[in-house]
Regions:
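Acidic, small-polar-rich N-terminal luminal/periplasmic segments of exported/outer-membrane proteins
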Residues: 16, 34-169, 525
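Periplasmic-side early beta-strands and strand-to-turn transitions of outer-membrane beta-barrels
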Residues: 160, 167-169, 177, 189-287, ...
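Repeated loop/turn-to-beta-strand initiation elements of outer-membrane beta-barrel proteins
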Residues: 170, 197-200, 241-244, 323-326, ...
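Conserved C-terminal beta-signal and adjacent last beta-strands/turns
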Residues: 191, 361-380, 421-424, 523, ...
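Structural signature of Gram-negative outer-membrane beta-barrels, strongest in the C-terminal barrel
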Residues: 235-239, 368-369, 382-384, 411-545
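Gram-negative outer-membrane beta-barrel transporters
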Residues: 424-427, 431, 541-545, 566-662, ...
């Protein structure tokens, strides 16, 4: 059976079972009922219905995030079409792809073409996005280039998280859940009026325990969480025309690192016997070299783990001038990353890694927006300064006879000027035009890799370089509303991403050469329609022309006699589409489904150099890109009354298609097989509306074995990061 047929059958089956199987028990919608709720978003920096915005987007409420077990940004790939978030070697370095547009790198210094922001503050680098999601009002995932309305420019899209705001009335609540592997999670908030015109909100969350992996040699567990995060907000409204919101957040993560398992047998550098490939995805291995442990400053008996912190402060001010509104967003964020990982997944010191990163980011945005009318406009400027210091330690003793230490600093300054206007040509036709100009200077300082004394030495000294980019982008769109409940839109947009550097552990001169900015021209058409008061269907189709796409290539370095990764630029084409459906056929029944399709091909000369210098290079011109063609998912829920209680049964599921990472990893087969995931929730609440609920939940209830990524650091060790097995638990929630 084809993937297309499977997706259609699953969607039809879910809808049929919910509608037909529950019809006898569920009452029909009364004339006063509204089957569909209006979803209000701020994707265009104004509050408006998502159905009136000509952007393909997915919007998930805070409650939906809980039901779908989305506790951090990576989990969104199980709820959004054409989105993948791959953890580099299972680490806290996420690699985002949206509609096939992404950037694959295990180091910290390069930006992502998929932007992520919290409360209007954009994260500069992907490593900043790995905090807990808690006390969230909603998340908006915008597909396609963004940048003519706010903040940073993106080629792939934008993920915007909006937290719950302070309230005038006193509110408080908590949730407490316990699950398999002794995992204990808790979250709470308190909100209310502090003084006349001054509101406050304090939120806190923690995750503890949950180890699900085992050391194949010692039997030690791995995977315990140890996270805590806090967010405070003050909202001050001194006048009707002036308001301020101050946000402060802090997070600490001392969790175990996810372990990797062996895809293929591993032969130590010191010789046989080999370690067999793991029969269980939940097996792993590690052991610290005492010399390496002393160098990085941790105990020699330590498990792979993190000691990361992510703190920040932001101030948003709004001044209403009557005909226009001025918004200022000032933010400072600091991230400290201390992460020990074993990327060979054995007790040998073949690829043991330690990442020591310090990142400071300051950003300032000024935006002036008109009031509502036939002509609506917004214009602004965005400034960002990033300063990253990173030390990357690699214990290669068993394979290469030493410990490599890579150090560098990267400083980036960027300024973006943007403007967009919408004009209502007729009652049913609206035109949009947006422009943007970005200027960025990115400088790499002191890139150097050295082996400890007495071990083989790499030649060369500290390297450096800089790249300055001036990048125009823009958007043109037409919206047509033949009916009040239907929007048709067509757009042409251009997104850009700045160039950068390959900051891997090499001191060969080409490593300091910058790669060029990438440019993407997107053509898109779409429809958003409330077909009936109980059925909503949104669909989009797109075609991308990608110039100078940034790709991690592979070359053979004659100095170190091993493969090294180096970013190169190539052209490609990507096309695809999405369909989102929401249906409330009967009172108490809610069904949502999505399907996404994406395929891409390289369209320029792109050479991969084999390890064996006697073999000719491989040209990937015309070959497919590395991302899944099909994504599918949805959820079905049914709520009914049983005596004095309300019961809700909910199930959500997702499908991820097969894809190969052949270009990044050469001729070896690192294909990630397709997989299905399913979760379920059963919630009991008082029918009277009392403020407590009890939920029994299950994640990966079909106990599917699947991989999040497959890779190698040195060719001797082919590894994968597995997804979590089945877990079950109970959650108690109380809010007033």
């Amino acid at each position: 059976m084809s993937i297309r047929t499977m997706a259609a059958a699953a969607a039809a089956g879910a809808i049929f079972m919910s509608a037909a199987g529950l019809a006898a028990a569920a009452p029909a919608l009364s004339p006063g009922d509204s089957g569909l709720e209006e979803v209000v978003v701020t994707a265009q920096r104004r509050e408006e219905s998502a159905q009136n915005v000509g952007i393909a987007m997915s919007v998930l409420s805070g409650q939906s995030l809980v039901e779908k077990s989305i506790s951090y940004v990576n989990d969104l790939q199980n709820a959004v079409p054409n989105l993948q978030v791959e953890p580099a070697f299972g680490s806290s370095q996420p690699q985002f792809r949206l509609r096939g547009v992404g950037f694959i790198d295990y180091t910290s210094n390069n930006t992502s073409p998929v932007g992520v922001s919290l409360d209007g503050v954009a994260f500069a680098l992907p490593i900043q996005t790995q905090g807990q999601l808690f006390d969230i009002d909603r998340v908006e995932v915008l597909r396609g280039p963004q940048g003519t309305l706010y903040g940073r420019n993106t080629t792939g899209g934008e993920i915007n998280f909006i937290s719950n705001r302070p309230t005038a009335e006193p509110h408080a609540g908590f949730s407490l859940e316990y699950g398999t592997h002794n995992e204990l999670d808790a979250e709470g908030f308190v909100s209310g009026k502090l003084a006349e015109g001054l509101l406050g909100r304090l939120s806190v969350a923690t995750e503890q325990g949950g180890a699900w992996q085992r050391n194949r040699v010692t039997g030690q567990s791995l995977g315990d969480k140890d996270k805590i995060a806090v967010r405070g907000q003050l909202q001050w409204d001194p006048t009707d025309a002036l308001d301020f919101r101050l946000g402060v957040h802090g997070a600490q993560d001392k969790s175990d690192e996810q372990g990797l398992y062996l895809l293929q047998p591993f032969t130590p550098g010191s010789g046989p016997p080999a370690i067999a490939a793991d029969s269980s995805r939940y097996a792993t291995g590690w052991a610290l070299n005492p010399t390496f442990a002393k160098l990085i400053g941790i105990n020699a008996n330590s498990k792979p783990g993190l000691d990361n912190s992510n703190d920040g402060i932001d101030l948003t001010a709004n001044i209403d001038f009557g005909g226009a509104r001025l918004t200022s967003i000032s933010a400072y964020n600091k991230l400290i990353r201390r992460e020990y990982a074993d990327w060979d997944a054995t007790q040998f010191n073949d690829s043991d890694e330690y990442l020591n990163s310090d990142l400071n980011v300051f950003s300032q945005e000024l935006r002036l927006a008109s009031s509502r009318g036939a002509f609506e406009w917004v214009a602004g400027v965005f400034y960002s300064n990033e300063d990253l210091h990173e030390n990357f330690y690699s214990d290669l003793t068993d394979r290469l006879g030493g410990i490599a230490v890579t150090t560098y600093e990267q400083v980036a300054n960027s300024v973006g000027v943007f403007a967009q206007g919408n004009y209502q040509l007729t009652d049913t036709l609206k035109a949009t035009l947006g422009v943007r100009e970005d200027h960025e200077n990115r400088e790499l300082i002191g890139l150097n890799t050295a082996f400890l004394p007495g071990a083989p030495s790499l030649t060369g000294g500290a390297l450096g370089g800089s790249i300055t980019s001036n990048l125009p982008s823009g958007k043109a769109e037409l919206d047509y509303k033949p009916l009040s409940s239907t929007l048709l839109y067509a757009s042409i947009s251009r997104g850009v991403k700045s160039g950068g550097f390959t900051a891997h552990n090499t001191v060969t001169a080409p490593a300091a050469d910058p790669f060029e900015p990438e440019k993407l021209t997107a053509y898109e058409i779409g429809v958003k329609s409330d077909v009936t008061r109980t059925l909503r269907v949104d669909a989009s189709a797109y075609f991308y022309r990608y110039r100078d796409q940034q790709i991690l290539g592979k070359v053979f370095d004659t100095t170190s006699q091993s493969f090294i990764g180096r970013f190169v630029n190539a052209d490609s084409r990507i096309s695809g589409g999405e369909i989102d459906l929401e249906w409330h056929p009967l009172a108490g029944i809610s069904i949502s489904q999505y399907v996404g399709f994406a395929e891409g091909y390289y369209t320029s000369k792109l050479l991969d150099v084999p390890l064996d210098p006697t073999l000719p290079p491989v040209d990937y011109n015309g070959r497919p890109e590395s991302f899944p063609k099909w994504t599918y998912g949805g959820d079905v829920s049914y709520t009914w009354n049983v005596g004095a209680f309300s019961v809700t049964a909910e199930s959500n599921y997702s499908f991820h298609d097969t894809y190969s990472q052949f270009f990044l990893l050469g001729s070896n087969d690192f294909t990630i097989p397709k997989y299905w995931l399913a979760n379920a929730n059963l919630t009991l609440a008082p029918a009277s509306g009392a403020p407590w609920t009890v939920t029994l939940w299950g994640r990966n209830i079909l106990d599917k074995s699947y991989d999040l990524t497959r890779n190698f650091f040195l060719p001797s060790s082919e590894v994968a990061a597995a997804g979590e097995p089945t877990t079950v638990g109970i959650r108690l929630t109380y809010k007033y």
